[in-house]
Structures are given as structure tokens and as C-alpha cells.
């Protein structure tokens, strides 16, 4: 059973980063940094597929094995892959420090082999009042992504 994972984020533009995942008890601690962002919040999600053959678009929708509507990371109604937002400072750097109790590095909610994506816009956490909000959080285009792999 994997206890650690890593993801290298890359895109067509300046956005890049490295994200680390570590299983701790019933949670996964997600840490790292992303550079090249515009200042402010950016949606941060695990997507269904580990397929980046056509850039980030081939990663599919948010990882959602429970067939729920999109929500925030603390909501009961959320996709497993909904990790909310990361916030970039005025220098375009987002420091990631998330503890989540729904994603896993093993079993049916495992994120290993799936794609981590950072988005162009803030995630409205499913509260945007339209259909797209309940699917994507209106987070916009995919700036950078990478497949989550087992780490030592």
C-alpha cells in the first residue's frame, strides 16, 4: 500500500509545480508549491484519468466515484477530487497545505494514477447558482496538470 505520492504539474504556459501526498491515519496531507499563477484563488482538483496525451483536457472530469455534485473540500456533497482552491500571492506562488479525509492513496478512492489539475479561476465550491458550478465550480481552463504517482 502506497503511503506517499508525488505529482509534477506542467502546462502550456508558465504554470508549474510539485505536489506531495502523504497518507497520515485516515487523511492525506497534500503539500507543495505552484509557480507562474496570477494572484488569487485557483481551483485545485484531482481529475478522473491519468491521461495527459492531449494536455490537461484528456484527464477527464473531476474524480467522482460517488456520483455526487461538485462542492468544497469540507462539504458532504462533493466529488472525491474536490480539493477547493490554492491561493497565489502577488509573486504568483501558491503554497499548498491541505489535509483531506476523502482522497486516499489506496483502495476505491485512490488518487494514484489520476491527474492533479490547477485551474485558471477560483472554484466557487458548487455555490455559483448554475449547472456548471455543480460540475466544475466554474474554475475555468486547466493551466497545468500532472499524473499522481507512487513515491518512496
Curated annotation (Swiss-Prot):
Localization, UniProt: Cytoplasm; Nucleus
Family matches, as InterPro entries: SOD-like_Cu/Zn_dom_sf, SOD_Cu/Zn_/chaperone, SOD_Cu/Zn_BS, SOD_Cu_Zn_dom
Main location: cytoplasm
Cofactor(s) needed: Cu cation; Zn(2+)
Listed GO biological process terms: action potential initiation; anterograde axonal transport; apoptotic process; auditory receptor cell stereocilium organization; determination of adult lifespan; ectopic germ cell programmed cell death; embryo implantation; gene expression
Keyword Acetylation annotated: yes
Catalytic reaction list: 2 superoxide + 2 H(+) = H2O2 + O2
Extent of the signal sequence: none
Residues found modified as N-acetylalanine: 2
The record's free-text note on cofactor binding: Binds 1 copper ion per subunit.
GO cellular component: axon cytoplasm; cytoplasm; cytoplasmic vesicle; cytosol; dendrite cytoplasm; extracellular space; mitochondrion; neuronal cell body
List of residues that carry N6-acetyllysine: 121, 135
Zinc recorded as keyword: yes
N6-succinyllysine: modified positions: 4, 10, 90, 121, 135
Disulfide bond entries: 56-145
Family per similarity comment: Belongs to the Cu-Zn superoxide dismutase family.
Protein's recorded name: Superoxide dismutase [Cu-Zn]
Gene giving rise to this polypeptide: SOD1
Amino acid at each position: 500500500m502506497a503511503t506517499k505520492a508525488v505529482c509534477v504539474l506542467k502546462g502550456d504556459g508558465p504554470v508549474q509545480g510539485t505536489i506531495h501526498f502523504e497518507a497520515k491515519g485516515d487523511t492525506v496531507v497534500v503539500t507543495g508549491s505552484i509557480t507562474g499563477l496570477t494572484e488569487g484563488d485557483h481551483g485545485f482538483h484531482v481529475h478522473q484519468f491519468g491521461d495527459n496525451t492531449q494536455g490537461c483536457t484528456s484527464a477527464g472530469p473531476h474524480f467522482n466515484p460517488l456520483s455526487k455534485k461538485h462542492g468544497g473540500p469540507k462539504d458532504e456533497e462533493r466529488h472525491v477530487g474536490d480539493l477547493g482552491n490554492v491561493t497565489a500571492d502577488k509573486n504568483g506562488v501558491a503554497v499548498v497545505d491541505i489535509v483531506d479525509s476523502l482522497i486516499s492513496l489506496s483502495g476505491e478512492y485512490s488518487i494514484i494514477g489520476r491527474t492533479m489539475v490547477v485551474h485558471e479561476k477560483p472554484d466557487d465550491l458548487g455555490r455559483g447558482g448554475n449547472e456548471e458550478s455543480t460540475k466544475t465550480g466554474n474554475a475555468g481552463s486547466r493551466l497545468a496538470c500532472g499524473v499522481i504517482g507512487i513515491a518512496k
